[in-house]
């Protein structure tokens, strides 16, 4: 049985982790969301989230976006390549309902799976 937990090891925690991804990212995006990815040597994917107050004014909206993004990652973690991902949100993401946001994330995860070099 596959575990679908979201432990600390699956998160980007320090600024150096984020900088690593920003240096040479593979990009996949929609008008509202961009997911940057870079291969890691850990054998499992990790995720970091950036939801700027500039783009999403209200805290409860930022929290909803982060919660749905973490849940999408948690459910897809075993299908994803061993990459570090940074999810960047843009203006207009707060206007997406939960279903549209989840579908956009699934589309971007599939795109990263196709772009990743076979290992």
From Swiss-Prot:
Alphabetized UniProt keyword annotations: Endonuclease, Hydrolase, Nuclease, RNA-binding, tRNA processing
EC number: 3.1.26.5
SUPFAM superfamilies: Ribosomal protein S5 domain 2-like
Assigned GO CC terms: ribonuclease P complex
GO biological process: tRNA 3'-end processing; tRNA 5'-leader removal
Catalytic reaction equation(s): Endonucleolytic cleavage of RNA, removing 5'-extranucleotides from tRNA precursor
GO molecular-function term, one example from the UniProt record: tRNA binding
Entry-linked HAMAP family: RNase_P (MF_00227)
Protein family per UniProt: Belongs to the RnpA family.
Record's function text: RNaseP catalyzes the removal of the 5'-leader sequence from pre-tRNA to produce the mature 5'-terminus. It can also cleave other RNA substrates such as 4.5S RNA. The protein component plays an auxiliary but essential role in vivo by binding to the 5'-leader sequence and broadening the substrate specificity of the ribozyme.
Assembly and oligomerization: Consists of a catalytic RNA component (M1 or rnpB) and a protein subunit.
Protein name, UniProt field: Ribonuclease P protein component
The species this protein was found in: Yersinia pestis
Organism taxonomic ancestry: Bacteria, Pseudomonadati, Pseudomonadota, Gammaproteobacteria, Enterobacterales
Gene that this polypeptide is encoded by: rnpA
């Amino acid at each position: 049985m596959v575990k679908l937990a979201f432990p600390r090891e699956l998160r980007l925690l320090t600024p150096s982790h984020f900088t690593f991804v920003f240096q040479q990212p593979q990009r996949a995006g929609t008008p509202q969301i961009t997911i940057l990815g870079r291969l890691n040597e850990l054998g499992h994917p990790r995720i970091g989230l950036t939801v700027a107050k500039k783009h999403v004014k209200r805290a409860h909206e930022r929290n909803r976006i982060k919660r749905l993004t973490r849940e999408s990652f948690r459910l897809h973690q075993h299908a994803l390549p061993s990459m570090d991902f940074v999810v960047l949100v843009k203006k207009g993401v707060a206007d997406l309902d939960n279903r549209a946001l989840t579908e956009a994330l699934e589309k971007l995860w599939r795109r990263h799976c196709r772009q990743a070099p076979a290992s």
